[in-house]
Amino acid sequence: MEAGHGSMLLVYAVIAIALLILLITRYKVYPFLVLIIVSLLLGLVSGMPMATIVKSFETGNGNTLGHIAIVVGLGTMLGKMMAESGGAERIATTLIDKFGEKNIHWAMMVVAIIVGLPVFFEVGFVLLIPIAFNVARRTNKSLLLVGLPMVAGLSVVHGLIPPHPAAMLAVQQYHADIGKTIAYGLIVGIPTAIVAGPLFALMISRAIKLPKENALASQFLGAAGGEGKDGANPSAAKRELPSFGITLFTVLLPVILMLVGSWADLVFAPKTLPNDLLRFFGNSDVALLTAVLVSFWTFGARRGFTRDQIQKFCGECLAPIAGITLIVGAGGGFGRVLMDSGISKEIVNAATSVHMSPLLFGWLVAALIRLATGSATVAMTTACGIVAPIAAAGAVQVRPELLVLATGSGSLIFSHVNDGGFWLIKEYFGMTVGQTFKTWSLLETIISLMGLGLTFALAAVV
């Protein structure tokens, strides 16, 4: 449906994005509310019938949450079980022993990439930051040297590597092959994480000195005695940490199932029972559900947790993700209004007329929305709806898997004050706003630009 005409629709889109930035950054209005308000206003000024504006927004919101809410919920449960059982600590300590103290920043990057696969950035950060505090104290290293590689690994996984929920959303929107996307994501993501993580951390930790006293760190470092959650004794829990092998298997089980599912047609004839079974268990929802159920045994029952404790863990972990889930859904609603108002079509026409590469366009749109909303996931959600028609209609055809990477790279650019992650890192690291810009914001921009560059390089050879 087109409700407006001509180039004025492009002007409305620019004004809408500017209004998003103004309301979120200057007037501190919550992004969920801003996305709804701006979506409705955009529908009105673009000429959409009033009766269809709300329906359009609800359709986009529902289509987005219909998939992402399940992935987010299951991924968060898996991360919670791993944290409560000590699985994350097991992964960290094992890799630290293998890498050694001199290479601790490399170990933290690897830990973050592994742990971050099934969970959102904020969840992975909260799970791993206690480990970073303890590692920094034990090795007498700067928290920046230990922590920045960790957040770089989490960020790269967030935007570039399925089965992370944000990347999975882009895979779905572009109809990309998940197996190829994972492979390409690793090719682009690992070098990017190395540069933005350990190498950048080595440089910036020499230039920026954090205060010696950190109240949040003291809380985690001072929890050696007493009882843990649900009356569990910390020392007893530590003696019963899951093995490295079983922890790694449980965390990577969704990836394994999705990869095997993508090979179904190569192994079995289509529409046969074995083929259908592989595809069924390779579905992201089913793969994550399977991993969560397995974690109830590997991270739960085998660690001595009761059924009531496991159920409590699952309930506790869902409350913190409610806000980001609503924002993601609203981003999908905003993207649908852009489409139904005819703005997406005008953007397609404009981009086609200037012969912009679909990869560059996907990166640019996601980057603009990221700067406006502060959410990498919202940026990917909205940008995919805009860019997908260009990929289909443009003269230059590119692999949909590369579009996922380009859009994901754009969604990670320059985190600033409208991003919850910005404040999360500022407070936990004990930094000033200026220091957070020089570290976290710059790190995110390095990931974004290098991710785009490597995606273009990969496009030249695949």
Model-derived features: where do they sit?
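Hydrophobic transmembrane alpha-helices that form the pore/transport pathway of multi-pass ion
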Residues: 96-184, 372-409
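Hydrophobic transmembrane alpha-helices of multi-pass solute/ion transporters
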Residues: 2-77, 90-94, 98, 257-330, ...
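Short helix-coil transition sites and intra-membrane helix breaks within transmembrane domains
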Residues: 27-31, 65-68, 79-89, 115-130, ...
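C-terminal transmembrane helix pair
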Residues: 99-102, 189, 358-462
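Hydrophobic core segments of alpha-helical transmembrane domains in multi-pass membrane transport
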Residues: 12-24, 36-44, 72-77, 112-115, ...
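Membrane-interfacial loop-to-helix junctions in multi-pass transporters
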Residues: 7-11, 50, 62-68, 95-110, ...
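Juxtamembrane helix-boundary/capping and inter-helix hinge elements in multi-pass membrane proteins
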Residues: 46, 83-88, 98-102, 135-146, ...
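Long, contiguous bundles of hydrophobic transmembrane helices that form the permeation core
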Residues: 2-7, 183-312
